[in-house]
Design a protein with these regions (language model features):
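Short, conserved active-site loop motifs that form the nucleotide-linked donor/cofactor pocket
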Residues: 128-129
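A conserved short coil-to-beta-strand element within the FAD-binding core of flavoproteins
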Residues: 132-145
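Single conserved hydrophobic/aromatic residue that forms the stacking wall/gate
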Residues: 221-224, 228-230
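Core beta-strand elements of the Rossmann-like FAD/NAD(P) dinucleotide-binding domain
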Residues: 156-165
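Short, compositionally biased segments
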Residues: 216-219
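Rossmann-like flavin
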Residues: 2-110, 185, 189-203
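Glycine-/small-residue-rich beta->alpha transition segments that form the dinucleotide
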Residues: 169-174
Length: 230
């Protein structure tokens, strides 16, 4: 599946809370403060809403606000304000807290996946080869140096050698899985699976967290509809 999880996710575009990034930087992750990553957020997006110095306008990824303005939403906003929850017109802007309309990676009715935004425009380049129906099994090492990768293509195992670098972008699940299968990770985990240890790195495969997403259901005599024809 080209585009990875961006081709199957819920299409909601959320940068994350500024405090989280700043906390990472305070913990020693230099270069991960919100001010550090903001230029990259701006560079990647083409925001179709109100302009702001915090939003990008010329990036490859189209970001839109849901166009549906059901009357029910006005009641939700009013209820939130009565509970002292502020209405936030852009939760990817100055403040991240509050209630507001969802921003999505949808443009003119089409999902704006990483494949649509980044890969499709350049797939005709002569120095780019896209191999589908393939699964990376593990990285190949000569001592501590990564020299290639083992790939399963349909029913064949193929070894690819590299002369420069490998960028591992398998996502929150597959990236640590590939590292562990390659011998990089917690010693006890690898020994349990009889995987030779290349590099002990205790953080690999640990501390995965997902966001909280409470669901609510309401009943009304009003006609409800939803459209994503942005």
């Amino acid at each position: 599946l080209l585009g990875g999880s961006s081709s199957i996710n819920g299409l909601v575009y959320v940068r994350g809370n500024k405090l989280d990034y700043d906390t990472w930087a305070q913990m020693g992750n230099t270069g991960w403060s919100y001010d550090d990553v903001l230029p990259f957020f701006k560079k990647m997006e083409s925001y179709q809403g109100d302009t702001s110095e915090l939003r990008g306008l010329e990036g490859p990824l189209k970001v839109t606000e849901v166009s549906d303005r059901n009357p029910i939403y006005n009641g939700l906003f009013k209820a939130a304000e009565e509970m002292q929850i502020p209405v936030n017109k852009d939760y990817n802007g100055q403040d991240q807290e509050g209630i507001g309309y969802t921003q999505t990676t949808i443009y003119k009715g089409e999902r704006m996946s990483a494949e649509v935004a980044y890969l499709r425009p350049i797939k005709s380049r002569k120095n780019l080869t896209i191999i589908t129906n393939s699964l990376v099994k593990k990285l190949l090492f000569d001592g501590k140096k990564c020299i290639g990768l083992e790939v399963k293509n349909k029913n064949k195992i193929i070894n690819y050698s590299v002369s420069k670098e490998i960028i591992l972008s398998g996502g929150a699940i597959n990236s640590p899985q590939i590292l562990e299968l390659s011998g990089i990770g917690r010693r006890d985990v690898l020994e349990e699976k009889n995987i030779p240890l290349i590099q002990e790195l205790n953080g690999v495969g640990e501390n995965l967290r997902d966001h909280i997403a409470p669901r609510t259901v309401s009943y009304t005599h009003l006609r409800a509809h939803e459209t994503h024809e942005h």
